[in-house]
């Protein structure tokens, strides 16, 4: 395990030096297996991303978008071309072509399933989640959709009704992003919180694995209200 000082210095170097993507991926792979899994490309495909035949190019667009997002997140920079894409998305809203989350959940097989309501769990973590599930011997199925607006938690949890109001709420990720007393962007610009984000997700996946092994639950459904 790396110390917090080592993690900070590693992220600081990524932020202040201009590495090629190949150099960035290589350095990350040698320093942190968790960060390496996070940076792996997650492909939006015909299985996890259902869209109409006329919108299939959206899958490649989203694949590229989130890969660029993750690289810029850990290097604490925004490229002008990426900012242009964000502004374009804000106007065109291509993500509305994805299935609504409520539609996806209403069609899931929820028999003997436990809902894990993971606040602020975004698409950016899917490559990490998928790899960790495989490591823990868990069979994972991913479905990507869009949430309704406003995306704040209070107004954006209609999916709970499909589980009879019973669920396990995981707030740590959202608390880390918005209310942390340790990671303060006003004081430290480097995204050192990424390591704790991945720890929180990993801890929950291991908890789910334990519950499945103990047969406390037979199926886990992870749903998020919002996230990058």
Model-derived segments and their meaning:
Residues 1-114, 120-220, 224-228:
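…; additionally, a secondary subgroup of soluble metalloenzymes is captured
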């Amino acid at each position: 395990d790396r110390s917090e000082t080592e993690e900070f210095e590693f992220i600081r170097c990524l932020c202040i030096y201009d590495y090629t993507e190949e150099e960035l991926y290589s350095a990350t792979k040698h320093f942190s297996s968790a960060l390496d899994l996070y940076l792996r490309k997650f492909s939006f495909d015909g299985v996890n991303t259902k869209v109409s035949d006329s919108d299939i190019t959206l899958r490649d667009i989203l694949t590229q978008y989130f890969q660029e997002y993750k690289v810029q997140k850990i290097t604490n920079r925004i490229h002008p071309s990426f900012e242009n894409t964000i502004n374009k998305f804000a106007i065109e809203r291509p993500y509305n072509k994805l299935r609504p989350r409520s539609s996806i959940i209403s069609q899931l097989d929820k028999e003997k399933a436990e809902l894990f309501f993971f606040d602020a769990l975004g698409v950016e973590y899917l490559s990490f989640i998928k790899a960790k599930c495989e490591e823990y011997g868990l069979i994972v199925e991913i479905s990507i959709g869009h949430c309704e607006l406003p995306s704040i938690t209070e107004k954006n949890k209609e999916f709970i009704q499909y589980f009879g109001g019973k669920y396990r709420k995981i707030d740590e990720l959202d608390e880390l992003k918005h209310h942390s007393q340790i990671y303060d962007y006003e004081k430290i610009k480097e995204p050192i919180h990424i390591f704790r984000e991945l720890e929180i997700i990993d801890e929950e996946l291991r908890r789910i694995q334990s519950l499945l092994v103990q047969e406390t639950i037979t199926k886990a459904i992870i749903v998020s209200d919002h996230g990058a």
